[in-house]
Amino acid sequence: MAKTFKFIFYFWGAFVLVFALDQWVKSLTLAGLRWQSEYLDLTYALNTGVAFSMLSFLEHNLKYLHLALIVVLFIYLFWQKTLLKTHSIAFGMMLGAGVSNLLDRFIHGGVVDMFFWHKWFNFAIFNVADVMINISVALILIQEIFKKRKKDDRMD
């Protein structure tokens, strides 16, 4: 595969995998799958806000803000290709998760959440997309830290 297209393949591969996994788990949740354990429960909640239900006062208008942010990020990444080439998998994961949550907003009126961590403390209910967004941000930060360290080592 040509080097110039490899990053696009990685981006869309990560995008599709994260989107499909998140929607599959959400479909199981909507079909009634429930599970309880000492640490984590699989339940159902419809989040009309963003993280920790913030901005829920925007109600149905939040989906348009969400859509605008995703479109702006897509345009920026494909216009400024260096960032996309460097972090293609992470941005694919992030945008696949974001589009999956956006689809929920248009279809269900909010984001379908299902995981409830309750060992030691009660954490907000979250979904696969939320986890993937956090992992993608961590990947970008780790790559940037190591890139900076390599650059600093070369300067010594």
Swiss-Prot record:
What's its catalytic activity?
Answer: Release of signal peptides from bacterial membrane prolipoproteins. Hydrolyzes -Xaa-Yaa-Zaa-|-(S,diacylglyceryl)Cys-, in which Xaa is hydrophobic (preferably Leu), and Yaa (Ala or Ser) and Zaa (Gly or Ala) have small, neutral side chains
Subcellular location per UniProt equals:
Cell inner membrane
EC number(s): the record gives 3.4.23.36
Q: Membrane-spanning regions, if any?
A: 5-25, 64-84, 89-109, 122-142
Keyword Membrane among record annotations? yes
Which superkingdom, per the lineage?
Bacteria
Which PROSITE patterns does the record associate with it? SPASE_II (PS00855)
Q: Which UniProt keywords apply?
A: Aspartyl protease, Cell inner membrane, Cell membrane, Hydrolase, Membrane, Protease, Transmembrane, Transmembrane helix
Q: In its UniProt record, which GO terms are filed under biological process? A: proteolysis
Any idea what job this protein has? This protein specifically catalyzes the removal of signal peptides from prolipoproteins.
Q: Which NCBIfam families match?
A: lspA
Q: What is this protein called?
A: Lipoprotein signal peptidase
Q: Which organism is it from?
A: Campylobacter jejuni subsp. jejuni serotype O:23/36 (strain 81-176)
Q: What is the lineage of its organism?
A: Bacteria, Pseudomonadati, Campylobacterota, Epsilonproteobacteria, Campylobacterales
